[in-house]
Amino acid sequence: MRTRLFLASCVLVSAVPAAWAAGGAPMSMPSMSTSREQSPEDQAKSAYNDGVRDVRKADRFDASATELTDAKKKEKALREAHDHYASSLTKFMQAAKLDPNMHEAWNYVGYTNRKLGNYDVALAAYERALALHPGYPEALEYRGEAFLALNRISDAQQAYLDLFAANRGLADKLLTAMKGWIDSQRTAASGSDATAVDALDKWVQERAQIAGQTAGLTREGAASSWR
């Protein structure tokens, strides 16, 4: 509830477009600065960097949980992931409060909320990040995965198409997430409508074929062909 109230209040803050730094990477900080000397922007960067360190730990535990077969170890890894996602969310929210124009922080507010199952709150944060930095690839990909979780298939497909034109690597990541979603829906007792799942599966296969056929046209594909 506090998260929703915080996001709702921050949406009212006027947005000034911000320049994009490396996605997900820690931000550089002034040397020899103390918390008393730091500007709100520097304090925001510090909170953001702390959040990045925490979210990376969460991701490692989350990835580990998918590989574990022992029930107790899996449960422990998931609990650790949850706790680190919650901790990092607090830090990213603090960063966004100190610097409402930091789209990187808003993107991670969305990411951590999505990992915690707060999909509607996550979407609001992604929208904030994209309002500050239109076309921001990381937010488009993360938002696409949130659309999947909410069964908003056409929105997830559009997110993929937007990424396909701008960032093939993240487009591939979203397509992989779609494949995982399809598998999970087919194995779930109360999954989505079978016709809709089959239609998405066909679409994913078609898009994967197109991606493979055009891989050499991208900068990364051209570089790979010369190795």
Protein language model annotation of sequence segments:
Residues 77-90, 115-128, 151-159:
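Structural signature of tandem alpha-helical TPR/SEL1-like repeats
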